[in-house]
Swiss-Prot record:
One of its GO terms (biological process) is DNA repair. PANTHER family: HOLLIDAY JUNCTION BRANCH MIGRATION COMPLEX SUBUNIT RUVB (PTHR42848:SF1), PTHR42848. Residues 1-183 are annotated as: Large ATPase domain (RuvB-L). Residues 184-254 are annotated as: Small ATPAse domain (RuvB-S). GO terms for cellular component: cytoplasm; Holliday junction resolvase complex. This is Holliday junction branch migration complex subunit RuvB. Homohexamer. Forms an RuvA(8)-RuvB(12)-Holliday junction (HJ) complex. HJ DNA is sandwiched between 2 RuvA tetramers; dsDNA enters through RuvA and exits via RuvB. An RuvB hexamer assembles on each DNA strand where it exits the tetramer. Each RuvB hexamer is contacted by two RuvA subunits (via domain III) on 2 adjacent RuvB subunits; this complex drives branch migration. In the full resolvosome a probable DNA-RuvA(4)-RuvB(12)-RuvC(2) complex forms which resolves the HJ. The RuvA-RuvB-RuvC complex processes Holliday junction (HJ) DNA during genetic recombination and DNA repair, while the RuvA-RuvB complex plays an important role in the rescue of blocked DNA replication forks via replication fork reversal (RFR). RuvA specifically binds to HJ cruciform DNA, conferring on it an open structure. The RuvB hexamer acts as an ATP-dependent pump, pulling dsDNA into and through the RuvAB complex. RuvB forms 2 homohexamers on either side of HJ DNA bound by 1 or 2 RuvA tetramers; 4 subunits per hexamer contact DNA at a time. It is an enzyme of class 3 (hydrolase). Has 3 domains, the large (RuvB-L) and small ATPase (RuvB-S) domains and the C-terminal head (RuvB-H) domain. The head domain binds DNA, while the ATPase domains jointly bind ATP, ADP or are empty depending on the state of the subunit in the translocation cycle. During a single DNA translocation step the structure of each domain remains the same, but their relative positions change. The lineage of its organism: Bacteria, Bacillati, Bacillota, Bacilli, Bacillales. It comes from Listeria monocytogenes serotype 4a (strain HCC23). Mg(2+) binds at T68.
Length: 335
């Protein structure tokens, strides 16, 4: 496949628009992440009672789990406007200064991929986050002088798939740090049913569960698979997504019962057949299957680790007995 249907990254502008149309507006509508939601409910209510901006929030976890959606829900619950940007989009200190000085009291600033901010940009954020002020330098050379501008109280929400790449000074300035976890099959089934209702697509409970089962614990993938299975239901079925039709469609889309596609299987086969199950270094795996190291770390490893198909050790990656069994390969434990 040219495009991984089970990729947890957004593919194009059309998919971004599709996701936006599905987003809940309140925490009560947001499915899953119950611990995170319960804590945020308390923090938001407390900030509202004190008439203060919510403390800065860092959301981290694999792609597609709802970090952007949750940021927008937080802003909605606070009755605030949200301005969105991303780490790579803020190239110069002036870019960030322009955004910060445009904020109104109580606004939410959402920075996706916040781990990709440069250190120079981070240093501007420190006083903005701590003291709601902005230090800028006017002029150059001997006549240069520093001017401090006051900023209105605001909430910064940062999202990242790689929290370990954030500098300690930046990470320490977030008052709320939440990790988003993979979703359960039951939660994803509920999401699929909700999305099908919004799309006016007929689906039965078993059909929804079959899609959920193969969605890698990720709502973005569940919604994408539903769209594709819906196509099969309309063209090759009677318009209703049943368990039988979902299985047939997902098999044709090369998504197996555990949500693995050909690239996942190639990775596991490489570890097992070329390196006797491991341990083998990530760079070696990447070179062997023709993928970038970062792609494997962000897109494939988290789920394979979650379902117990892969182990990460100081010496490298190891395919587990569960992975052998799933691929139908005989497992011989070394003595």
């Amino acid at each position: 496949m040219d495009e991984r249907i089970i990729s947890s990254e957004t593919v194009d502008a059309e998919e971004v628009s599709f996701e936006t149309s599905l987003r809940p507006q309140t925490l009560s509508q947001y499915i899953g992440q119950d611990k995170v939601k319960n804590n945020l409910t308390v923090f938001i209510e407390a900030a509202t009672l004190r008439n203060e901006a919510l403390d800065h929030v860092l959301l981290y976890g694999p792609p597609g789990l709802g970090k952007t959606t949750l940021a927008m829900v937080i802003a909605s619950e606070m009755g605030s406007q949200i301005k969105t940007t991303s780490g790579p989009a803020i190239e110069r200190p002036g870019d960030l200064a322009t955004i910060l000085t445009s904020l109104e009291p109580g606004d939410v600033l959402f920075i996706d991929e916040i781990h990709r901010l440069s250190r120079a940009i981070e240093e501007i954020l420190y006083p903005a986050m701590e003291d709601y002020c902005l230090d800028i330098v006017i002029g150059t050379g001997p006549t240069a002088r520093s001017v401090r501008l006051d900023l209105p109280p605001f909430t910064l929400i940062g999202a990242t798939t790689r929290a370990g790449l954030l500098s300690a000074p930046l990470r320490d300035r977030f008052g709320v740090i939440d990790h988003l976890e993979f979703y359960t099959e039951e939660q994803l089934t509920e999401i699929v049913l909700r999305t099908s209702n919004i799309l006016d697509t007929k689906i039965d409970d078993l059909g929804a569960r079959e899609i959920a089962r193969r969605s890698r614990g990720t709502p973005r993938i569940a919604n994408r698979l539903l769209k594709r299975v819906r196509d099969f239901a309309q063209v090759r079925g009677n318009g209703t997504v049943t368990e039988k039709l979902a299985k047939e469609a997902l098999t044709l889309l090369q998504v197996d019962p555990r949500g693995l596609d050909t690239i996942d299987q190639k990775l596991l086969h490489t570890i097992i057949q070329s390196f006797r199950g491991g341990p083998v270094g990530l760079d070696t795996i990447a070179a062997s299957i023709g993928e970038e190291r970062e792609t494997i770390e962000d897109m494939q490893e988290p789920y394979l680790l979650q379902i117990g198909f892969l182990q990460r050790t100081p010496r490298g990656r190891i395919a587990t007995e569960t992975a052998y069994n799933h691929l139908g390969i005989s497992y011989e434990k070394e003595v």
